[in-house]
Amino acid sequence: MTSSSRTTLRNRSAAAFLFVLAVPGLAWAEGADKEYRASMDKMDAAMMKGMDPDPTKAWAKMMVAHHQGAIDMSKTVLKETKDPMIRRMAEKGIREQTEEQKMLEDWISKH
């Protein structure tokens, strides 16, 4: 066996080993990836609906949608992660974004 053949074999073996290690995470990655993509698509569509001739109203409407996207993504990560810091940040984000959403919606209803 030539040196080049041994290198190719080693590279293929390493790739196969890494694939085997990754397989348990693939189901999660596919599920979370789909949820994140759905959240982003929903947020983007809602932000476009928020366009308004008044730049202040447009900003407020788009921020409501943006905050909802952050809330949705935080809920996704909470279903999947056990990391304490990420969990705290996601939970805090949900609380703060929900509160700010309400403030913005109140402002929008008055203007």
Model-based region annotation:
Residues 16-21:
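Sec-dependent N-terminal signal peptides
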Residues 2-13, 25-111:
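His/Met- and acidic-residue-enriched segments that coordinate or traffic transition-metal cofactors
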